[in-house]
């Protein structure tokens, strides 16, 4: 990936257990820690302003693209407010009232059942990739597409470029959050090959975004994870004569791996930045080479000249 490396980030929340995706998305999207299962909200019920809210207030276009459903924890953390990440009706209503211009996720029965409500909220709605281009003239678009899994009919890289083309029509700029949500899902199930293929898909998406950027100097790309899952360790060991090799993407090589956990861990994750070299001098957010996950929000505020 053609990106510059920056400090590792810390995945935190208010309790002592490892963060869930709702709390970590809230931290990155709002700059505040909360408890697990809460989305865009403090433990006392206070609703938090997200980076999408800030961008909307500046007249910028906003968008979310995910291989998960739009009611998943990460997209919800950037666009909704509720005490429970599983409160689907509340999540959907909050998300549709968020003002986010583009909502794109994998097909979901709850979203499909609310197609009329989605359209009543002013969204151009489509369930076929062939119909995506037809929504470009609308101020708001809702794309429900087959994006899930390693054999997805629609590729995350392709739809991410469509999202960039849609949002970049706004001359005031845009903020777009893209999620490859299946690395986490496969690691939860200790499905190593699925996790590798999902990371490869993320890499292809990053490359597509970089190619789209070309020589542009007005767009910054941040790449990170909300947490690690499974305690995965991988090593390259000597080969033994009776080992069965697995060929992945035309490459046959022996790798040894182990999952040390069945859930999220507190392992620090990487942050990669293209377009700027940030000045990490705020000791409240950055200390000894580690940036708090809440610092992602404040970094984005700085990029929007809002801090």
Question: Can you name each region flagged by the protein language model?
Answer:
Residues 1-132, 203, 228-307:
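N-terminal catalytic scaffold of extracellular/periplasmic and nuclease hydrolases
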Residues 73-79, 147-149, 160-164, 169-173, ...:
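Active-site His/acidic residue clusters
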Residues 186, 191-244:
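Extended C-terminal subregions enriched in glycine
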Residues 139, 171-175, 218, 264-269:
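Active-site lining segments that contact anionic ligands and/or coordinate catalytic metals
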Residues 126-160, 195:
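Functional beta-strand-loop-alpha-helix junction segments that form "active/interaction loops"
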Residues 55, 173-181, 206, 220-226, ...:
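Beta-strand elements within well-structured catalytic alpha/beta cores of enzymes
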Residues 52-56, 130-134, 160-171:
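Short amphipathic alpha-helices and their capping/turn segments at secondary-structure boundaries
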Residues 31-36, 137-150, 184-190, 276-281:
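Gly-rich Lys/Arg/Thr-decorated short loops/hinges at beta-loop-alpha junctions or inter-strand turns
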């Amino acid at each position: 990936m053609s990106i510059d490396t920056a400090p590792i980030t810390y995945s935190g929340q208010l309790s002592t257990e490892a963060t869930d995706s709702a709390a970590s998305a809230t931290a990155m999207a709002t700059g505040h820690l909360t408890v697990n299962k809460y989305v865009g909200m403090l433990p006392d019920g206070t609703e938090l302003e997200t980076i999408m809210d800030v961008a909307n207030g500046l007249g910028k276009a906003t968008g979310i693209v995910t291989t998960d459903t739009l009611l998943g924890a990460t997209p919800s953390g950037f666009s909704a407010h509720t005490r429970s990440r599983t409160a689907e009706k509340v999540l959907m209503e909050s998300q549709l009232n968020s003002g986010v211009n583009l909502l794109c996720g994998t097909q979901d029965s709850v979203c499909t059942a609310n197609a009329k409500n989605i359209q009543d909220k002013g969204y151009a709605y489509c369930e076929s990739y062939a119909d995506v281009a037809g929504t470009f003239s609308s101020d708001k678009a809702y794309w429900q597409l087959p994006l899930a899994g390693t054999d997805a009919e629609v590729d995350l890289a392709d739809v991410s470029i469509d999202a960039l083309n849609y949002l970049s029509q706004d001359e005031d700029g845009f903020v777009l959050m893209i999620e490859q949500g299946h690395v986490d899902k496969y690691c939860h199930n200790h499905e190593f090959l699925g996790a590798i293929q999902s990371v490869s898909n993320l890499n292809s998406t990053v490359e597509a975004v970089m190619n789209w950027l070309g020589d542009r100097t007005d767009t910054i790309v941040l790449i990170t994870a909300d947490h690690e899952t499974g305690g995965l360790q991988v090593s390259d060991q000597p080969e033994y004569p009776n080992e069965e090799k697995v060929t992945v993407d035309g490459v046959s090589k022996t790798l040894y791996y182990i999952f040390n956990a069945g859930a999220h861990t507190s392992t620090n994750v990487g942050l990669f930045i293209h377009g700027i070299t940030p000045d990490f001098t705020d000791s409240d957010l950055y200390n000894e080479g580690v940036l708090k996950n809440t610092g992602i929000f404040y970094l984005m505020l700085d990029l929007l000249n809002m801090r």
